[in-house]
Amino acid sequence: MATTTEKTPAAPGVVATESNQAVPAISLEKVSKTYRSGQVTTTAVESIDLEIRQGEFFSLLGPSGCGKTTTMRMIAGFEEPTSGVVRLSGKDVTGVPPNRRDVNMVFQSYALFPHMTVAENVAFGLKRKKVPAAEIRTRVAEMLELVELGDRAKYKPRQLSGGQQQRVALARALVNRPSALLLDEPLGALDLKLRQAMQLELKRIQREVGITFVYVTHDQSEALTMSDRIAVMNKGRIEQLGTPAQIYETPATRFVAGFIGTSNILTGTAQRVSDTLVRIDYGGDQHVLANTPQQMSDLGLVITVRPEKIRLGKDVPDANVSRIRGTVREVVYLGATTHYTVRTVDDTDIVVFQQNSSDASNLADHGDTVWLSWRPEHSYVLPG
């Protein structure tokens, strides 16, 4: 028997949904931002639609100038969209000033007050809101414990490391209990090891507080490490939206394949072998096999394969896998892995990441002729 769900009317200015849980923390509807200088108009963000869920760690990822920071600034209220609607928890906040939006921002510059202690820095926003002193002490203590700085409450910022200062800035933003926290490349000033440690720390904190984090970065490893979902941006548009695994394993465009991780791009004219399999022949006994949907054209395919999916060896692989012969042009030993660059007969360079096992017989040297092979499901077909 069919059932129906009773819907409660939404409050004025709030989008009606099946339940409060279904209301996105942040939504952008056909949002664009253009800048005009004289007769020149520059489009920073072009008609993007985006929903960020309650309680998720969401990253806006892309190269410099892709529009990710402008998008975040429109969410925060520091920039007003040229067109479109910005909603927070279903409420239209387009045109609402930043101080009236229930979001806080953390920047790469920590902006801590040097003359104040750690506790005073964290308490600053609460004091401006005239929160009772007893509540301030409780909330500040809770936040400092959360960021593991409870024993540093009386320290001045200059007495802290860069990572500790970043955690103070994070506590200062979270103590206000915003519905969402916006982070604009906050780890950019830290060294590599500290940055990697802080990535895990940020994810832990986000899980514990349970609020929405929106993270802007150009660093793919940061986005892949921390995010529940990622929007990859390019030239003011969202090229792909998905989980880290979806973005990495099944890139939607050639740009995403090249920007996220390392990809080998192969092109050619394909012939359909079966309903779900195509083959590109490279002469002789060399070919690439790829799984494809039935409706995809057989001509002019672009195929990507990740370096770690490829096996390198001296023996001819089986015919039921992709197999290409080439000459080793470069060998880079990196401890756990060795990276090979192999030049094929059509002068295409293919990069291979091979795990270094105790069996050294699989290793190849510069100038060696080798076979590369991978399974059909590891060849991902992109739009031509």
From Swiss-Prot:
Quote the Gene3D superfamilies the UniProt record gives: 2.40.50.100, P-loop containing nucleotide triphosphate hydrolases
Q: What is its EC number?
A: 7.6.2.11
- This protein is called Spermidine/putrescine import ATP-binding protein PotA
Q: What is the lineage of its organism?
A: Bacteria, Bacillati, Actinomycetota, Actinomycetes, Streptosporangiales
The encoding gene is: potA
Q: Which GO terms describe its molecular function?
A: ABC-type putrescine transporter activity; ATP binding; ATP hydrolysis activity
Where is it mainly found?
Answer: membrane
Give the species this sequence originates from: Thermobifida fusca (strain YX)
| Purpose of the protein | Part of the ABC transporter complex PotABCD involved in spermidine/putrescine import. Responsible for energy coupling to the transport system.
What NCBIfam families does the record point to?
A: potA
The UniProt record lists the ABC transporter domain at 26-260
